[in-house]
């Protein structure tokens, strides 16, 4: 969508239309829910058609095509729930979703519901009074095992919920590692100076613009995030030009058989966040109803 204005400045609308409305009508579909506009989705042939239209004045290149970047190795770390917790998750999901009519789900309600399932996977959840209820240590144990395997190498940890951060801090307090929560430029400087072993970061607070490549080569996502853009930009805090390392490692802690796997599938497909969350939730509701 942002491409129209850039091309208009070059050709005054000759290739992509004289105004943004023409561009949208030609290359996008307006999504609605319950009669209300939600967002725009590119038509199936939008990308190749647009690229062909502007090919005589533009060249499309990925950063890795023209920059010297380290190799980026992404991998998933399977987290297995014990039998007791697995049954509790299944019951929690049923109780949460079976009361919902999949035909009336909105992007907002889907985000809230999948957020609760992601919290369960992480090991704690906010109750109706916004108090934290601890559920299990399966993911935190897997995280600490991963940190131990790094043998002291610095690591950026992306967390999703405030209770994730607090439980991670409690677990790391039992080690001799120097741990910081990212709060601003001072932490960026300390990280790049090699004075932080584990830097806890919420993805929305530093996914853009920060140069952290000098301080380490490891990233771990404690809580998978639906947004491909946030994942991609988070990775680029270390995977960027000027890194002193030849490899950068990005790990994802993924609870098996649960919503974590749906999030990872969405990231790999690079699909629209809101639409994907709604589709995944509807599929889970339909599956549960089919089991009754």
Please describe what each predicted stretch is.
Residues 226-292:
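A conserved SF2-helicase RecA2
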């Amino acid at each position: 969508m942002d491409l129209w204005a850039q091309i208009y400045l070059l050709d005054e609308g000759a290739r992509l239309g004289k105004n943004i409305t023409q561009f949208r009508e030609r290359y996008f579909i307006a999504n609605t829910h319950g009669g209300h506009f939600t967002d725009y989705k590119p038509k199936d042939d939008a990308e190749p058609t647009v690229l062909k239209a502007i090919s005589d004045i533009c060249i499309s290149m990925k950063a890795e095509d023209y920059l010297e970047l380290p190799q980026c190795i992404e991998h998933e770390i399977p987290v297995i729930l014990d039998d007791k917790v697995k049954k509790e998750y299944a019951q929690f999901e049923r109780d949460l979703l079976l009361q919902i009519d999949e035909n009336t789900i909105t992007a907002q309600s889907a985000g809230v519901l999948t957020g609760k399932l992601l919290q369960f996977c992480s090991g704690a959840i906010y109750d109706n009074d916004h108090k934290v209820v601890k559920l299990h240590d399966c993911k935190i144990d897997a995280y600490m095992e991963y940190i131990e395997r790094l043998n002291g190498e610095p690591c950026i940890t992306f967390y999703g919920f405030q209770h994730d951060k607090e439980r991670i801090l409690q677990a790391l307090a039992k080690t001799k590692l120097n741990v910081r929560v990212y709060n601003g430029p001072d932490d960026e400087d300390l990280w790049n100076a090699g004075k932080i072993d584990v830097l806890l970061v919420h993805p929305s607070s530093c996914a853009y613009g920060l140069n952290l490549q000098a301080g380490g080569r490891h990233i771990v996502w404690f809580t998978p995030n639906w947004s491909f853009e946030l994942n991609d930009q988070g990775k680029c805090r270390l995977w960027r030009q000027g890194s002193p390392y030849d490899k950068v490692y990005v790990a994802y802690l993924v609870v098996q058989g649960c919503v974590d796997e749906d999030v990872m599938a969405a990231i790999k497909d690079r699909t629209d966040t809101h639409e994907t969350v709604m589709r995944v939730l509807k599929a889970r509701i339909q599956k549960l109803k089919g089991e009754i």
